[in-house]
């Protein structure tokens, strides 16, 4: 029987050499998850933890038509300061390290995606048990579908905005959407928060800035780091895309248009040196990583990128809103 992982904090703030060991770690992680499921009652998990573990063990894989790069492995790396990329080729996941434990932002689309993230965390030399808090950009399956698995495997607390709490716990997107409810594995929320919530862990502070629209509780996270003596502001923007949302006559999210408009203005006003989005293509992360590997110390630094991201998102939103209004001229916003 595989023993539970060590609770010893790993040494943060350096990039250990990545090897093929992350691939070999997959089977041991799966065994560890089964060990925790079988022994949840022994370590304080209780009936709920055991039930969730059982569901995860038997739940079929969903969204088989998702883009291949959403689950394609990529070597993890340090971005700036104490921030590490631990996601797949197409879907971001960010580890924010501290001397008192780490924060993980986003989870991938499924248990499989969560295990990919876990292997990347371990490949960087960190311990899964040192991940103390899980946070999320928004309650869509591609970013939240692996939260339950990560919570079971790390023992971390899950922090979710109040607007997305129900979606995370019920296991599906809330709001009228042309793509349907897009189910995901539900996860128990430990802390629901509002705007400007601060998450402090060691020397790291993250601030939640609610930017609803894409989902009701869409959350943009900000933090500050130091890179070789240079202070940098970092923003993890929540998506601003429409992504199938019904903008005209949305009964489940009646203020959706006003929410989008307020979020465009709010995000545009955030001072940002480094923008780290939830999808690779939203920030050309692969190209930036190649620049970094070639020795560019400012590969991820661009003080104008967030405003360009917002401008492009707002233009696309206005175009889609006009289309929906033309298609339903008698409907109310």
Range-by-range predicted roles:
Residues 65-69, 228, 242-333:
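Accessory terminal helices/loops
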Residues 20-21, 31-36, 42:
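Glycine-biased, low-complexity coil/linker segments
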Residues 45-59:
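Bacterial N-terminal signal peptides
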Residues 105-108, 131-139, 159-161, 211-213, ...:
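Active-site neighborhood of phospho(di)ester-bond hydrolases with catalytic His/Asp-centered motifs
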Residues 65, 72-73, 78-80, 115, ...:
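Metallo-beta-lactamase
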Residues 112, 139-145, 165-168, 216-219, ...:
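Active-site environment of divalent metal-dependent phosphoester hydrolases
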Residues 69-124, 128, 221-242:
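Conserved beta-strand hairpin/beta-sheet module of binuclear metal-dependent hydrolase folds
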Residues 112-115, 119-198, 294-295, 301, ...:
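Active-site HxH/HxHxD metal-binding segment of metal-dependent hydrolases
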